[in-house]
């Protein structure tokens, strides 16, 4: 069953309908006590935990009050940003985790999934602990340390509210970054839903009277983490980008650009040759994307398959031109059937 959403129309009711329809079809929105939603099931699902870690490392933020600061104290929270068109994914993740709330910021063009109660922050931290791969793990460790301090500072409390919280949280092992092979879990799928894109480029060859269709998978992130390490040194994202490049058999590119009179530096990996495209398609066929980028990937894959079957560009050029009219930023139609029975809820 496909659920179609058109840009330019009121989006929220349709998106909500599509998600609830998928849920009810699978009989897992009827009873909030369904076992698949329990922490024990998610703890047994490496794909869910690694996907969520990648998504948070790409588009998520841990906000933790500095205990040495004199500013107003606040509870820790986790905020994940989505494109407005990815509201169904945000609602889907909120529903299966039962953590936080989803806020649609139509005037700003994005959606927030915000987790800020202590128990939910603990759950998310517990689930992704051991699955992160970037310098952002520092913020997870700060969150876990905050939880440990909360337990220590309140273990003798007689307040019912605090006792209830303490009954649902516990000390966590502070685990290091995951160093397993990239292809071993769904981390790259979550990270790509946050920071990657697919391209179908069509251009005329300068020295030939012909047209070329080029396909790219591209992932770009900033070069350094915003906090210094314990020795006051910058922490680079190069190690993880180098590992991704090794997996894809490509190189890491560095670039700088100026936005609003400020210079930004980033690392990029690009799949563009036959070997790297084969690698990335095998990966995403095993661990599918879950955002609307899944639709771009399927179109990208369709053209790649035509390209591999046909030596003449003219045999599939028309299809490539047609697809580009409803692709990436020009996309106007969406469906979310790929969330139905997806690997996040299978153990």
Outline where the language-model segments fall:
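Internal intein/HINT superfamily modules and their associated LAGLIDADG
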Residues: 1-347
